[in-house]
Every structure is written in C-alpha cells, then in structure tokens.
Amino acid sequence: MNLLIMGLPGAGKGTQAAKIVEEFGIAHISTGDMFRAAMANQTEMGRLAKSYIDKGELVPDEVTNGIVKERLAEDDIAEKGFLLDGYPRTIEQAHALDATLEELGLRLDGVINIKVDPSCLVERLSGRIINRKTGETFHKVFNPPVDYKEEDYYQREDDKPETVKRRLDVNMAQGEPILEHYRKLGLVTDIEGNQEITDVFADVEKALLELK
C-alpha cells in the first residue's frame, strides 16, 4: 500500500503516521529522515543537498525530488509499500512525484487528509508555555501547570497566536492545490482530526482497510 498523509501543523499527522506504520508495516518516509539518510550515505542528491544546507540556502525542488526518487527506488518500497509524510509540499512537487511513481512503476493508493478546524489548531499550537526556571513545557488548556503564575512562564515567538495563524495560512495556501490535484484522481480520504487520538486512528484504519 502506497500512501500520502496530509494535514496542517498541529493536526496530529505525525502521531497518526507512526500508528499507520506500526499497524500496516509500511515504510515511513519523512522528509527530514530522507535528507539525513541521503547526506549520511553521501548519495549524489545527499551531497547536493548538503552543499545548499551548508551555505544556509533553501534546498531547491529538483534536489528534494531527487532525494525522494532515490528513496522510493530502494528495495524495501516494492516489498512493503510507503507512507510519505511531509512531501509533497507544493503542487510542483506533487507533479514531480506523479512522474517519479510512473517512472518507478509504482502507484499511489490513497491520500489521508487529517482535517482540523484552523481555529482549533491556533488554540492547540499557541497554548504552549515554558517555565522560565526549569524549561519545562506546559499547555495553558490541555496540560496546565499546577501552580501557574503568569510571571513564571514565557511563550516562544513562534508559538504566539498571530505567528501560528500566519504559519497555518501559508500551509493552507500550499496544501489546497495539492489536495485538489489528488481529489480529482479520487485518492483523498478526509479524516476528522478533532477527536481523541484513538478515534482518529480508528477512522484512518477503516479507510485504509477499504483500500487494501
């Protein structure tokens, strides 16, 4: 089974990806892991990526696409299938993935889209607070400290509501064309992500068993 998993930051995509991989025994391909492995193994694309990263530059699409292609060409993929997590991030990368899969004789079976209302995500992501003395992390709503005093805690810049909202807006603008592309191919299953983790996975599992 060959899958993509999509969802906005904070939707619980990483948690569900780990559960899918454990339950179905498929290869988890996350962008970060792919880059690290390609650079550690000094593949052609890994060396290219490192040259950009070392200069503090963004890795261009053709290198990212090349790293994905190298990984999808490995033997375990044909045997186990894959779950792509964090790629494609743009519609151009989605088109490159289509071409790569066709070239390698692979087929995408489904796209799992974890849906959560953006306003809920702002609450989830902007509630994180850190104790000034201990560095411990808490959440104002979901995991509040017992002895909360505002002056004892601070919030990182990128956890502030306005920053979180901007990040979500960027992700939505990039993600919508990709979802639309795969919807036209009849591949997308929307999963309600604003429920307990186990309930989300029950819905994911049901959808995947129907694909098999």
Curated annotation (Swiss-Prot):
Its main location: cytoplasm. Transmembrane segments: none annotated. It is found in: Cytoplasm. Keywords: ATP-binding, Cytoplasm, Kinase, Nucleotide biosynthesis, Nucleotide-binding, Transferase. SUPFAM superfamilies: P-loop containing nucleoside triphosphate hydrolases. GO terms for cellular component: cytoplasm. It comes from the Bacteria. It holds the Pfam family ADK. Residues 127-159 are annotated as: LID. The keyword Cytoplasm applies. Its EC number is 2.7.4.3. GO terms for biological process: AMP salvage. ATP binds at residues 10-15, 128, 137-138, 195. It catalyses: AMP + ATP = 2 ADP. InterPro entries: Adenyl_kin_sub, Adenylat/UMP-CMP_kin, Adenylat_kinase_CS, P-loop_NTPase. Residues 30-59 are annotated as: NMP. AMP binds at residues 31, 36, 57-59, 86-89, 93, 156, 167. Pathway: Purine metabolism; AMP biosynthesis via salvage pathway; AMP from ADP: step 1/1. Monomer. Consists of three domains, a large central CORE domain and two small peripheral domains, NMPbind and LID, which undergo movements during catalysis. The LID domain closes over the site of phosphoryl transfer upon ATP binding. Assembling and dissambling the active center during each catalytic cycle provides an effective means to prevent ATP hydrolysis. Belongs to the adenylate kinase family. This is Adenylate kinase. It comes from Streptococcus pyogenes serotype M1. The lineage of its organism: Bacteria, Bacillati, Bacillota, Bacilli, Lactobacillales.
